Amino acid sequence: MAQKPNFLKKLISAGLVTASTATIVASFAGSAMGAAIQQNRTTNGAATTVDGAGFDQTAAPANVGVALNAVITANANNGINFNTPAGSFNGLLLNTANNLAVTVSEDTTLGFITNVVHNAHSFNLTLNAGKTLTITGQGVTNAQAAATKNAQNVVVQFNNGAAIDNNDLKGVGRIDFGAPASTLVFNLANPTTQKAPLILGDNAVIANGVNGTLNVTNGFIQVSNKSFATVKAINIADGQGIIFNTDANNANTLNLQAGGTTINFTGTDGTGRLVLLSKHAAATNFNITGSLGGNLKGVIEFNTVAVDGQLTANAGAANAVIGTNNGAGRAAGFVVSVDNGKVATIDGQVYAKDMVIQSANATGQVNFRHIVDVGADGTTAFKTAASKVTITQDSNFGNTDFGNLAAQIKVPNAITLTGNFTGDASNPGNTAGVITFDANGTLESASADANVAVTNNITAIEASGAGVVQLSGTHAAELRLGNAGSIFKLADGTVINGKVNQTALVGGALAAGTITLDGSATITGDIGNAGGAAALQRITLANDAKKTLTLGGANIIGAGGGTIDLQANGGTIKLTSTQNNIVVDFDLAIATDQTGVVDASSLTNAQTLTINGKIGTIGANNKTLGQFNIGSSKTVLSNGNVAINELVIGNDGAVQFAHDTYLITRTTNAAGQGKIIFNPVVNNGTTLAAGTNLGSATNPLAEINFGSKGVNVDTVLNVGEGVNLYATNITTTDANVGSFVFNAGGTNIVSGTVGGQQGNKFNTVALENGTTVKFLGNATFNGNTTIAANSTLQIGGNYTADCVASADGTGIVEFVNTGPITVTLNKQAAPVNALKQITVSGPGNVVINEIGNAGNHHGAVTDTIAFENSSLGAVVFLPRGIPFNDAGNTMPLTIKSTVGNKTAKGFDVPSVVVLGVDSVIADGQVIGDQNNIVGLGLGSDNGIIVNATTLYAGISTLNNNQGTVTLSGGVPNTPGTVYGLGTGIGASKFKQVTFTTDYNNLGNIIATNATINDGVTVTTGGIAGIGFDGKITLGSVNGNGNVRFADGILSNSTSMIGTTKANNGTVTYLGNAFVGNIGDSDTPVASVRFTGSDSGAGLQGNIYSQVIDFGTYNLGIVNSNIILGGGTTAINGKIDLVTNTLTFASGTSTWGNNTSIETTLTLANGNIGHIVILEGAQVNTTTTGTTTIKVQDNANANFSGTQTYTLIQGGARFNGTLGSPNFAVTGSNRFVNYSLIRAANQDYVITRTNNAENVVTNDIANSPFGGAPGVDQNVTTFVNATNTAAYNNLLLAKNSANSANFVGAIVTDTSAAITNVQLDLAKDIQAQLGNRLGALRYLGTPETAEMAGPEAGAISAAVAAGDEAIDNVAYGIWAKPFYTDAHQSKKGGLAGYKAKTTGVVIGLDTLANDNLMIGAAIGITKTDIKHQDYKKGDKTDVNGFSFSLYGAQQLVKNFFAQGSAIFSLNQVKNKSQRYFFDANGNMSKQIAAGHYDNMTFGGNLTVGYDYNAMQGVLVTPMAGLSYLKSSDENYKETGTTVANKQVNSKFSDRTDLIVGAKVAGSTMNITDLAVYPEVHAFVVHKVTGRLSKTQSVLDGQVTPCINQPDRTTKTSYNLGLSASIRSDAKMEYGIGYDAQISSKYTAHQGTLKVRVNF
């Protein structure tokens, strides 16, 4: 047989060729063998050796060795000695009826070893010391067998031409490791597998195994004799295996690794396999010395499919039988194979990385008698069919896959099972596997990652017996409890994604167990069997308020009396099911009052939550659930009393109460959300325990509903002490159903609309036991309201009932309404029991109506009405037909008050109104008291007769010109007293009031007619009112009635006091008064007297009286024309005419020394208060006091001359002299003068004269504009242009500052500053050109070449700050950016300015010849001017563009001339502040914008001389002239309302003389740079020139305002220095600084330079 190449041997021995690779290689070698086989050698000698002896011979007989790859047929009963070194032969065939000895003397490889001919016999193999026998099992094909040749090279068929199968080792008998270190190797060319192994039959036995090593390097080998266990070392390569299916000792035991033998796995990937088969009548107990596997290199399979078996640790169960207890010491795998009814028992510790439990058919049993541990990343897989596993010690199954099998792991008492269990890893949708705890136990995760589920879609976790099973982590499994004492204890954070007690245990039934929590936990499935047989007994929450039990199931079913226990610190139950119907069939037991939360906040209004059980405890020591949040669900609370501290109802949520008792301390809900339903289906009553609050005042419920009565007579709500109901609507489902019973005492509140919705009324209300009930909203009842046992019904809204009665006469109805309400009762056929009293406590009015025709008795009766608390101003309207003196009782009606009469607005009373009946007030009848005045009202055209001497009430009528009052209570020497007749001016008037006796009326008289009978005196006005509206008639026949008005009387302007007979009746005013009409021209009264001191009278109507005596009163003429007529009039106080007319119609009026006149002139309409003295009247006076004339003058002062207004008209009929005038001018017009004169016709008149020019001139003089040049002339021009809008707007100015600012902003300008800045811009450009000329003129001049210096800064014209460094080329381009900051202070009265300029000059020049240079340049500038002083706020922007030509000529030695011409265009944007007054004289700022173009042009010429003063110093004196001319275009301002000016200007020009010198130093070399320094100084003097005479006019103005003159200085001084830096002949850079100084003017300029020479 051909040998394998050496490299292949090395690969295999090194483990670099896998089992599959080796198979491919071996197959290749076999397929090539057909051509390689030479011989079929047969034995025939006594001493047979493969090197030749004992085999068939050649033709010339010789001992020829057996060729490699030959097959050997043993024909003779002689042993065979394989003595060829590294011999490799195809196989052995036993062809003799003897057991044949085979000795391996050299390392030998054999293929098959068969006894196919004589199968009763075998080859007995003996391996010599240190020798290796490798068996490949290579077979022979038919073609190969037919083609073999003998030693004589003659074809002799092998095995008669029949094939030998691969792996035919049936001929193997005893294998004797004759001497130490011999080795048997199974390296099958055609590897076998575990399912189809190479089986060594019963004849194959091991002898002297202690000397040998058995290597399985390729293929699966199954041995049948226990002697194989005696081999010193069995080595199994990756992917290969050995199967022990052996006989056993008398105890059916196979001892492995005994006596120092070992079974080793030599591979690196842990796929080598040791299989232990439990065999019928043979080995069933595998006794292991040490541990199998380890170092993660092999898999051990224990197979009891055929018969029960046991894998035992020889050292005892507490020792490892598989792997060792460390990461590297574990077996790579452990497989347990069982079958239906078969048991595999592992009596020792198992440490394997991966474990497989497989059952050929269902219900195989695996028992682990000690630890099972697959390690941190190990796995367990259940395969083939369902099996059961029992553990006895804490075990770690790692990542366990139940493989979609109904497998079970049973955990005994006090054992911890660790792992992460999956029902079907290949299909997560499947559910399989059960973990059963017999008693106490723990199920833990094997993963350090808390996000990894402990169980994932397994069927169940069972607690089958009494004990506590502790769970943690996340589980997707059903929890099953099989014993009443079974408990699942959930650690903090545990999640159960499954049901509880829905399915029977494996092998048992469910029972009512318990779930307890150590912290927060989640159970997503239903709890408790719906049939109730397996309902849960108890759920106990963690004793921690911060922990939550989340329940996601729709059915939470407890056993009878089952509880959910909230311990002392409470905890939260969170309900999250999305099913439509959710049932919690548990009692909620509360350990500590106001603890614990039920959170169903996630439920929607499409879901119904039913709680069938008690919540908390109601009793002497209430224990309430801290909070129950129902979300938006409909929640039904039934089958037990409920105690909840806070009931939270989400939007659209509803709670239904049944027939039990409910304590809800408070509800939390959005305003107008949430519904409570009372539905006592078992009996007709629901009870609200004391302290219940449904809704709140700030957040009422949407609805409280009384459910249908069903088969009951009524639906009754029994209300405990202190219960409050707040809802927008309180409704009843059935009409006339729903009754309230308040009998627990205390105070109850019912807030909301009670009944009436959809026409459904409630039934009855009953109050007993001293209970106070407040119905704050509208309430509608069909039945009666009964109040007994000192109870009080408080009504705050409309109230409807059949009647309101008190059987024991102790009931009180109290009105607490804040707005008007109506009480509607039915007329009764028989009298009802009287109320103790009606109390009014709120400020709202109450109307009591009666309807129906059942009888003539009233629906509510009482003899007392009491006003208390906040009822001041409230009105009670009694039912029609109840008078003040009857009220249906034997005694008159008593009206009491304790609310006083004072309010923030004055006097007020609570009132009772009757209608449809006349009343008589008897003397002694209790109506009000001295400190608590009440009101009596007539609601119809009926009468009241007052016989009480003192009536502590005012009387009024509701309807105008209805009701009569007769006042007869006075007695001789004691006038009667009443507190007003009518409520005030403008209110309804009595039709008639009659005073038959003297009276003090301490209030108003509001009557169409009030008659004061002859001889009767009435004093009116006081604490209850001071109004008089209507008419008072003095006297019943003779006109000799008298009326006296108290201090402060207010008569309506239309009121009238008349007399039944001319010149009779007196009217007296005791203090201040507004007076209406008194008497008339035909029937004057006898006298009108004003007797108060230091008082005043407002005259609103005409007064006709024989005597009018105003005393010292100050008179106010309130109406437009007041007439005084009669006999004599006396005035000795101020007459304030306002703008009205006082007419003296007749008689003589005498004015005393204190008389003065005050009038008001309103120029807007020309009205002036004045006095008219008609013919037949005379006014006599001496000299009056000061005449005060108030002028409200907003009128236009745009007039000339004098206007007049008459103050007293009557000429000589005014006999006297007015006092000196005092003018008080208000309004916006300051620009007129007023005076008082007596005209030629003797009338007194007021004059008004225009004074605008003087006012404005003074305003300007006292303002910042004062002293500004030209301002006085422009002010005169402005105020004389009276037809302009600006002038008219000025006249609204309120004060001198506003006036000055308005005018000053118009008549001053900034044109001088702008022009000077524009000229300076042109000079800046010329300076830059002079710099360039100063440099270029040095070109080719020997005298100056050495000293050539840099440029200077900005100076006038051609005065350079120094010349640039010498050029060595004929032409170049240059650019000089510059920045200038100039400040001109105020000078000569002309406002200063600040100007900032940025610009750049860019030039290009060339040498025309050696002495002449010419060039051109452009300049771009931007200047921002901010004007100062009185022009502060004005701004100007100037954007300029210029074009220039320049040149320089060298004259005679050291003399030169240079010059330039410039033309520039500037765009000017000017913004000037102006002002505007609104109609009220309020001043606002506006901006006048002017945009125009400016053109400036000119030139300059300078001559100079270069003088070398000393070595390194060049002095150049210079002198020259500059001329510039500037012209602005005309423009019109925009942006203001009245102050836009048209501006017209002419040209400006200027000629300057320039004298100065510059000094240049020699070149300084710094590193590689040449630096040229320079300093200079120049004087610039203005020789001649002028600024443009700019003129401006407003719209409508004819004479223009002129611009302000230039006041700036003529002489200025320039000082500067600069430096240029040159790095090479082409590039040059520079920097310079200049200061320009003159009187009150400074400017600073900085320049940069860059030049490129060509």
UniProtKB/Swiss-Prot annotation:
Keyword hit for Cell cycle: no
Residue ranges constituting the Autotransporter domain according to the UniProt record: 1366-1654
Pfam families: Autotransporter, rOmpB_passenger
UniProt keyword annotations, A-Z: Cell outer membrane, Membrane, Periplasm, Secreted, Transmembrane, Transmembrane beta strand, Virulence
InterPro entries given in the database record: Autotransporte_beta, Autotransporte_beta_dom_sf, OM_autotransptr_brl_dom, OmpB_passenger_Rickettsia, OmpB_ricketsia
Source organism superkingdom: Bacteria
SUPFAM superfamilies: Autotransporter
Propeptide: 1334-1361
Record-level GO cellular component terms: cell outer membrane; cell surface; extracellular region; periplasmic space
Keyword Phosphoprotein: no
The record's account of how the chain is modified after translation: The N-terminus is blocked.
Record function comment: The 120 kDa surface-exposed protein is a major structural protein which may play a role as a rickettsial virulence factor and/or immunogen during infection. The 32 kDa beta peptide may serve as a membrane anchor.
Similarity field: Belongs to the rickettsiae OmpA/OmpB family.
Protein name: Outer membrane protein B
Source species: Rickettsia rickettsii
Gene encoding the protein: ompB
